[in-house]
C-alpha cells in the first residue's frame, strides 16, 4: 500500500475510533444526567413525604376545638366574683366535653382566659385579642363601661359577647352582638313588683312604695322609670316620689323625713353598694320602719346591723338549696356571686347557637342571634338579645338570708 492510501486509511480508522469514543462519552454523560434527574426526583419525593407526614402529625396533635373567650376582671375589685364565674363556665365546658362535645363531629370546647382588670380599655383590647385567637364568642365583661365599649368593638369584629352580670337594658338594646344571660333591669323591676303584689313579702303587708330617683346616670333614671311603670300596672300604690341629687347626710335626712311622713311600706332606691350604709343609717335616724327593695349589687352588704329587711332580685340566690348551687359547691366551694348561674348558662347558649346554625365554629355570622331556649343538667335557660322575660328571678330577704 502506498503512503498516500495508507495515510487515508489510517485517517479514516482514526476518525472512526474518535467517533466511537465520542459516542461513548455522550452515552456516559446521558446516564449521568439521568442519574442526577432521578436523584433530584427522589429528593423531591422524600421532602414532600416528610412534609405530608409532619402535617399529618401536626393535625393529629392539634385537633380542631371550639374556642370560647372569657373576659372578666380577674385582678381588680371584682376578682373573686370573676373567678367564681370562670369556674362556673369551666363546669359547663367539662360537662359538654364529657357528653360528646359540640356538633356531630364532637368538637371539644377550649377556654381562653383574659383579664381586663375592670378597665374598659383593657376590655376592648382583650376582646380583639380573643377574636384574633379564634374565639367564636366571648363571655364577659363584668364592668358596665367595658360593655358599652364592646358594643362598638363587636359590631366591627362580629364576635358576639354574652354578659353574665351587666343588666343595663340600654347597653344591650343598642347592640347587634351583645346578649344577656342574666336578667335585664326591666325584667328585674317587673319581678320585684310581682313579688310585692303576691304578698310573699311576709315582713310587711303595707303595699305602698316610695320611689327615689338618684340623679347619677341614665341607668338610675331608667331603673326608676321601669319600677314606676311596673308598680302602676299592679295593685300597689306609689305614695312618694323624689329625685335625689346626692348622698350627703342633709339630703338623705330630708329624703327620709318625707318617706316617713308618706308611711311608705317599701323604699326603692337604685343606688350602688357604696351608698347603702349612708342610706340605711339615714333611714334609721329618721325612724323609718318599712323595708327596702335593692339591686343585685346590694347582696354582698350586711344590712343586719340596721335591722331592715332588704329584698333583692337575684339570678340565683346563693343560699338557696338548688341543684346548681349544690353542684357548684361540691366542685368548687362556696358561692357568693350572682353571676354564677348566668355564666354557666352562657356556655350552653353558645353550644346551642352553634348546633342550631346561628353561630359558626370559627367566627360568628353577621346576624343577630334570636332568643334561644335550651336545657342544661341544672335546669332550663332563655337567653336573647334583650329583655329575657322568661328568666327565673329569685327574690331573697336579707335578714338571716332567708329565701322567700
Task: Give residue spans per PLM region.
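An alpha-beta-alpha
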Residues: 178-243, 350
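Extracellular/periplasmic periplasmic-binding protein-like sensory domains
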Residues: 280-344, 355
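Segments of small-molecule ligand-sensing domains
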Residues: 328-341, 351-400
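Extracytoplasmic "Venus flytrap"
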Residues: 69-90, 114-120, 143, 216-221, ...
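Periplasmic-binding protein-like
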Residues: 70, 130-142, 162-164, 208-213, ...
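Short beta-strand elements at the ligand-binding edges of bilobed clamshell
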Residues: 170-195, 306-318
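C-terminal motif of bacterial Sec signal peptides marking the signal peptidase cleavage site
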Residues: 49-51
Amino acid at each position: 500500500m502506498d503512503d498516500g492510501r495508507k495515510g487515508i486509511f489510517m485517517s479514516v480508522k482514526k476518525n472512526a475510533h474518535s467517533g466511537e469514543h465520542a459516542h461513548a462519552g455522550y452515552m456516559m454523560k446521558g446516564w449521568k444526567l439521568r442519574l442526577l434527574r432521578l436523584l433530584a426526583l427522589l429528593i423531591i419525593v422524600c421532602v414532600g413525604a416528610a412534609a405530608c407526614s409532619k402535617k399529618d402529625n401536626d393535625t393529629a396533635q392539634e385537633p380542631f376545638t371550639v374556642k370560647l373567650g372569657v373576659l372578666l376582671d380577674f385582678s381588680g375589685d371584682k376578682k373573686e366574683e370573676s373567678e367564681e364565674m370562670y369556674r362556673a363556665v369551666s363546669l359547663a365546658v367539662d360537662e359538654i366535653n364529657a357528653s360528646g362535645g359540640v356538633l356531630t363531629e364532637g368538637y371539644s370546647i377550649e377556654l381562653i382566659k383574659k383579664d381586663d382588670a375592670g378597665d374598659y380599655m383593657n376590655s376592648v383590647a382583650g376582646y380583639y385579642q380573643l377574636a384574633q385567637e379564634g374565639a367564636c364568642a366571648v363571655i364577659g365583661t363584668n364592668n358596665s363601661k367595658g360593655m358599652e365599649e364592646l358594643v362598638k368593638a363587636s359590631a366591627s369584629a362580629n364576635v358576639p359577647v354574652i354578659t353574665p352580670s351587666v343588666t343595663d337594658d340600654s347597653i344591650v338594646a343598642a347592640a347587634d352582638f351583645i346578649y344577656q344571660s342574666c336578667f335585664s333591669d326591666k325584667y328585674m323591676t317587673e319581678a320585684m313588683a310581682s313579688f310585692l303584689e303576691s304578698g310573699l313579702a311576709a315582713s310587711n303587708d303595707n303595699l305602698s312604695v316610695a320611689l327615689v330617683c338618684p340623679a347619677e346616670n341614665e341607668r338610675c333614671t331608667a331603673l326608676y322609670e321601669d319600677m314606676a311603670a311596673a308598680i302602676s300596672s299592679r295593685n300597689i300604690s306609689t305614695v312618694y316620689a323624689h329625685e335625689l341629687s346626692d348622698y350627703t347626710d342633709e339630703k338623705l335626712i330630708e329624703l327620709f323625713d318625707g318617706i316617713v311622713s308618706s308611711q311608705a311600706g317599701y323604699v326603692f332606691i337604685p343606688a350602688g353598694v357604696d351608698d347603702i350604709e349612708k342610706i340605711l343609717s339615714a333611714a334609721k335616724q329618721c325612724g323609718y320602719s318599712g323595708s327596702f327593695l335593692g339591686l343585685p349589687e346590694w347582696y354582698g352588704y350586711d344590712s343586719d346591723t340596721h335591722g331592715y329587711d332588704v329584698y333583692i332580685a337575684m339570678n340565683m340566690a346563693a343560699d338557696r338549696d338548688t341543684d346548681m348551687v349544690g353542684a357548684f359547691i361540691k366542685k368548687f366551694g362556696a358561692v357568693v356571686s350572682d353571676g354564677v348561674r348566668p355564666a354557666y348558662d352562657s356556655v350552653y347558649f353558645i353550644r346551642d347557637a352553634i348546633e342550631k346554625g346561628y353561630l359558626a365554629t370559627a367566627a360568628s355570622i353577621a346576624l343577630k342571634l334570636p332568643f334561644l331556649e335550651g336545657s342544661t343538667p341544672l335546669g332550663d335557660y332563655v337567653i336573647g338579645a334583650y329583655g329575657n322575660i322568661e328568666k327565673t328571678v329569685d327574690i331573697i330577704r336579707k335578714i338571716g338570708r332567708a329565701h322567700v
